[in-house]
């Protein structure tokens, strides 16, 4: 069974028939798009029969299941995207402009730090979304019999390792935010 076939079977098992499964170019490009209701699988996952590929496909289906059940953290994360994108683009330029024009304690620097904190919040909201999608994937792969025994355990390890990348990214962002607050927070150059 390929990643795409496993994805279709998992979605069907949950009564989700309105989600399309598509192959997308590149590697590590697997994602679920709630706007278009598509599970997008990279070339290396879509046609592969490896346990890892099936696990990745199942994880993306986990997001489709979250969408279908109106999982609150997924909705919250989706609603944050436009604001976070703007904040991510403007935070560092604001900090730099603030430092160059008004010094370390400039209100522009503070605004830049606030905008950066939106990205940190987004990453924190992402954690339960990713862990839940993986848990759903493992549970369904086991209950549907798509994977068995050691294969389920291996998939749990692969998805767990992938989830840790989100934890590491969030931790790095938190440390960067703390660094910005320590460097620039509350300072006045008057």
Where do the language-model regions lie?
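Membrane-interface starts of transmembrane alpha-helices
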Residues: 80, 107-114
């Amino acid at each position: 069974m390929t990643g795409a076939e496993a994805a279709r079977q998992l979605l069907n098992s949950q009564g989700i028939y309105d989600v399309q499964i598509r192959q997308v170019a590149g590697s590590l490009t697997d994602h679920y798009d709630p706007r278009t209701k598509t599970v997008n699988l990279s070339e290396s996952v879509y046609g592969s029969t490896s346990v890892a590929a099936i696990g990745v496909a199942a994880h993306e289906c986990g997001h489709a299941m979250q969408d279908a059940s109106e999982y609150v953290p997924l909705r919250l994360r989706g609603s944050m995207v436009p604001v976070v994108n703007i904040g991510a683009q403007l935070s560092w330029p604001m900090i730099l402009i603030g430092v160059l024009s008004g010094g370390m304690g400039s209100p522009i620097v503070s605004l830049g730090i606030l905008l950066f904190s939106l990205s940190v919040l987004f990453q924190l909201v992402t954690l339960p979304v990713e862990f839940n999608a993986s848990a759903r994937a493992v549970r369904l792969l086991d209950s549907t019999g798509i994977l068995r025994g050691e294969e389920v355990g291996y998939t749990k390890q692969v998805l767990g390792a992938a989830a840790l990348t989100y934890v590491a990214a969030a931790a790095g962002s938190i440390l960067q935010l703390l660094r910005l607050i320590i460097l620039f927070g509350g300072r006045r150059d008057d």
